[in-house]
Amino acid sequence: MTSPKGKPSPKRSAPAPTTAALTPRTEERTEGATSSASASASSHISSSFDSPRDDTVVFTGYTAESKHNAHGYERLHDIILQDGDTGADSEDGRANEDNVILFPHAEELANAAAGINGDDDNGRVVRLGTIQHLEESDSSEDEPTLNRVGDIPLEWYKDEDHIGYDIEGKKLMKKERSALERLLEATDDPNAMRTIYDALHDEKKTLSNADLQLIFNLQRNRTTNPNYDMYSEVQEDTVVFDPLNHPLARSGGPSKRAFVPALHDMKVIAKMVRRLRKEEAERKLRPGKEEKEEEDQLLWDDGHVEMDTHTHFKYFNRVPKPKLPPPGTFESYRPPPEYLPSERAKQRQARLRAIDRKEHFLPQSFDALRHVPFYHHTIQDRYQRCLDLAFFPRAQRTRLVVDPDKLLPELPDPKDLRPYPEKLSFHYKGHTATVRSVSVSPNGQYLATGCDDHLVRVFEVQTGRLMKRYDMGAPVQQVEFCPSTSLNILAAAVEYSLVFIVPTFAAHTLVNDHTIRFLRAPGLSAGQREAAHALGAVDTLGGRAVTQTTLDADETAHEATADLHDIEEREKRAEFVDASAKERNAGIVVKIAMHAKVKKFCFHIKGDYLCALCPKDHVKYRQTIMLQLSKRKVFCPFRKFSEVVTDCRFHPREPIFFLATTNSVRCYNLMAHRLQRRFKASGGVTTCLSIHPEGDNFLVGDTTSHTSWFDMDFSDKPYKRMRSHRGVVNALAFHPKTNAYPLFATGASDGQVHVFHGMVYDDYNKNALVVPVKILKHQRPVYAVAWHPTLAWLFTSTEDGVVTAWTE
């Protein structure tokens, strides 16, 4: 059996039940009923599960000795009444039959409740309004709740060694049961199927037969007492059934046709249903119509005036007439002197025809408003006004109201796109003029800067230490490391020449020797290059340099392989010049002399080819010059090209060359020797160009503060055109490892560097995702930006000679 608090009780023998009854107040019956019969005809129903009648309330329970079967009802004090003659009525068999057992305990309890055994003397009746004193009992169920944790989730104690606290605050420890003990209990205990677990007290309790009977009745929506008859109160003479007078018994009953609707009735009902559904759908489409009908209506509202369609259209679709312009200063009766016409102007006005005159009068000055004469052109002006109103075009244009916030794309939070450069970490000092270019070595260990103070400086990235300075003798336009890790070359554009430097401290000796032979000995085979690695070298003050024996061998090899038939042609384009002894001591190996100032240049990904731009060369086809360093070849690929070039780049994976002009970007196929595509750069003059490492996208900056993202698979026009700066975009660059860091940066003359997250997907159904993530601010215009090859670090240079490193 389960107590009212959900606490299961162990199985035990059924206690002797007792009856607490409330004898109803009897009423005399007028139709031959005796007083004794009316007193015994009381009705008793369960107070917990059935509705009591107006004249009878009976509660049948158990005595205090067996209060463990009515644990929840012992604490109810003002519930039960007793009449004085209850004992007399208990002898009546009718009264005993009407008693109801709330919680039957098998057949024994039912018989005891009905008074069959004659144990009614053991019952105890309490009057309503008195306190029922509980008697002492040794039953375990009569004990109060041991666990005093209250109404809280018991899951809070699942990780503890106790289940709660008793009334004295002591812990109630858990009972540890092994898996074997639980298995034995489940197999050996005959009452395992009727045993439940009390989680509040950490113990098992067995359900009695009465508990199972109660659960069975509740599951089937029955009364708790199986012996209760809800129709015991009904008198036999109150309900009389005569089969012959029943409607179904007369004339054989109704036919089946009476219950089947007629066909025409079904059609009418279906039509009504369709009309109701249609009205419901229209009501959903116009949710505000019913609300307007419920509101108070204006008495003189034009919306309730009945009018035809034409009048309704003219009334509700009228276009307001255009207003007259306000009078100007020249129409004043006392205008300023500068508005008064001269005699020459009056004569010119008089010579014009009336149709050619802008105004029909000339400004005049009067001392007072009353001196102003009548305007002779009043009627003509009114007539012209009427013509304008009658013939001016009336047109209605639907204005589309769009929320600007809905037009913006949904972008992710920049915090979720980390890492990207956020804070200033390093200052590389020592520059005294504008730093126009920065470049990072392929291994990310060294940083080279080109400055207007004629010096090329190489710093160590991690420490900021100045490793080497190279005096170029003129302002340096650009510096760049060779992207190939097998070559240690630092190239610099200095006015009319390209200078190739070998910073010996930046690579191993074998790499340095291989680089020198790569630049000085064209035509050597791979075996000869490997054999050349074994030649000796000495250290000088200017760095590590090759011996004179090595130089002589290189010069002999160069003279033996020189193309004598192409000397004049080479002189027209560019010329390779070997460095002097002093320059070789400083690390300078080769110079390339140009006919005009070199503005920009770029390396191929393998380091053998190089393209230089000389936009101010008077010979148009020499503006773009390509060089092959290993063979010292010079050629101009664009013979009939006449546009001014601004920047150039090699495709990182394919033999494609990008050339940026003032208003377009040309894409050339170097294998087919033809123009492959042309991209239109809308806006101002292009200033810089950067190719995505995957090769399918590129960026273009211009003088109108715009950065254009081009997708080669999308269109010839920009996929995105971003205006984030307020000055000329001077530099932009993609991160070399976009798979790990999908970033690119733009620097402009407004002193800001904008960092973007630019994700390119392999799926052609997804467009590139461009999200601005950070703005890095400087005091002066930014001229160059460069990314670290393996980290999310950004290097910038400004007009005032500040070179900084921004890290994560």
From Swiss-Prot:
Keywords: Nucleus, Repeat, Ribosome biogenesis, rRNA processing, WD repeat. This is Ribosome biogenesis protein BOP1 homolog. HAMAP family: BOP1 (MF_03027). Residues 12-24, 33-50 have a biased composition (Low complexity). One of its GO terms (molecular function) is ribonucleoprotein complex binding. InterPro entries: BOP1/Erb1, BOP1_N_dom, WD40/YVTN_repeat-like_dom_sf, WD40_repeat_dom_sf, WD40_rpt. The keyword rRNA processing applies. It comes from Leishmania infantum. Pfam families: BOP1NT, WD40. WD repeats lie at residues 430-469, 640-680, 682-720, 724-766, 777-808.
